[in-house]
Curated annotation (Swiss-Prot):
Protein name: Uncharacterized protein YobT
Binding positions for Zn(2+) 2 per the UniProt entry: 68-69, 162, 212
UniProt xrefs under InterPro entries: Metallo-B-lactamas, NDM-1-like, RibonucZ/Hydroxyglut_hydro
Family affiliation: Belongs to the metallo-beta-lactamase superfamily. Glyoxalase II family.
UniProt keywords, alphabetically: Hydrolase, Metal-binding, Zinc
Binding site for Zn(2+) 1: 64, 66, 143, 162
Organism of provenance: Bacillus subtilis (strain 168)
Gene (UniProt): yobT
Cofactor(s) essential for the protein: Zn(2+)
Entry note: cofactor: Binds 2 Zn(2+) ions per subunit.
GO molecular function, one term: hydrolase activity
One Pfam match: Lactamase_B
EC number of this enzyme: 3.-.-.-
Length: 233
């Protein structure tokens, strides 16, 4: 596991050389929030990192319900029983293994690794606009119907799940980067992803943090370029 810090955010990267999978610890004054639960075997590194910060883990936020973002959820929820688990209302169905679409959604199939045996039940379902400590919840559908991003309002760090990727080059979810095509292959709807990417770019974040790839500081121009490329196909 590799640990990288940007201001209040700690990036934990598993398998950094081969198939980098990130989750994040966001440090508050008196507590810590975990964003995503990485892979099934990632819990040891996550627990170690939480303990190193020396503050109680109060929240576990999930950007979406793919297996490489919720893999250690059950173990972490058991280890930190006071931590409140939160996911979007929409992706809470995916967390239960339900991949059916709603009538008002684009009827493209949900892709990617959907967990089938998660036992943990969320304490709160997010719809967008909620604040969890210093984090603002932003709905960003596209990679999955209920994908959610989180903006640290203290410093502008944006934790965007798989709304963008940075491994293999920056790209909007659904835009294939052949050096690392897996996020695109797992994307539900590229058109929705482009809309969400534009919403995030309009936030003018100071740093972009995603599920796959290193921190990108001052990302606005590169985000806009990636959006234009995605629009062109």
């Amino acid at each position: 596991m590799r640990i990288t810090q940007y201001q209040t955010v700690w990036q934990l990267t598993f398998f950094p050389a081969l198939f980098p999978v990130n989750c994040y610890l966001v440090e508050e004054e008196n507590e810590v929030t975990l964003i995503d639960a990485a892979l099934p075997g990632s819990y040891k590194g996550i627990i170690q990192a939480v303990n190193q910060l020396g503050k109680p883990l109060q929240h576990i936020l999930l950007t979406h319900a793919h297996g490489d973002h919720v893999g250690s959820l059950d173990t972490l929820a058991q280890t930190f029983p006071h931590a409140k688990v939160m996911i979007s209302e929409r992706d809470s169905f995916l967390l239960q293994g339900d991949t059916s679409l709603r009538q008002d959604e684009p009827q493209t199939p949900i892709k990617g690794g959907i967990p089938k045996h998660i036992q943990t039940k969320p304490h709160q379902l997010l719809t967008g606009g909620e604040t969890i400590g210093s984090l603002l919840a932003i709905p960003t559908p596209g990679h999955t119907p209920g994908s959610m991003s989180f903006l640290d309002t203290r410093n502008g760090t944006l934790i965007a799940g798989d709304a963008f990727q940075l491994r293999g080059g920056i790209a909007v979810s659904g835009q294939i980067k052949w050096a690392f095509p897996f996020p695109a292959f797992a994307t539900w709807n590229k058109e929705e992803a482009i809309k969400s990417a534009q919403l995030l770019a309009d936030k003018a974040p100071s740093c972009l943090a995603v599920g796959h790839g290193k921190f990108l500081r001052s990302p606005s121009e590169r985000m806009r370029q990636a959006i234009q490329k995605a629009k062109k196909g």
